[in-house]
Amino acid sequence: GYMDMRECHEGTRAMVGRTAPPSGTTMKHLKPKEAVEFLQKHPQAVFVDCRSEMEYLFVGHPVGAQHVAWNDGPDWEINPHFVGQVKKVASMNRPIVLICRSGHRSVDAGLALEKAGFAEVYNVVDGFEGPLDDKHHRGTLSGWRMEGLPWEQL
């Protein structure tokens, strides 16, 4: 069937409903409001927005999030330096909270961090904009922005 091109770059793996987390992962999942509470309680945690630079700048991003793209345009290739760039902003023993647009890329990014030895990885469920509604709009069903949590854009 026809698939919106913007959907494609998240990969077909993300399109299959992930019921159980892959084995060997200790990743935890937080709803946006839970993520805010977690970050307030754990000042040592590092909040990473792993969307593309364009999304981060122009769609807006959560206040306090560091930007490290998991994949970026024009070809949406995986950023080979992702883990190294996260290591620059966070040590391996600090909790990492990951957010993307709707919660798919952040799971893949989180698995890569776990493989690299990060002990405490959290994924923000529904991401910044949430899933598409029946009118193909994001930001109406769930997600960071719809829940009225602090965000900014340029």
Regions picked out by a protein language model, each given a short descriptive name:
Residues 98-99:
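Short, surface-exposed ligand- or partner-binding patches at beta-edge/loop junctions that are enriched
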Residues 1-45, 53-95, 106-154:
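Rhodanese-like catalytic fold shared by cysteine-dependent sulfurtransferases
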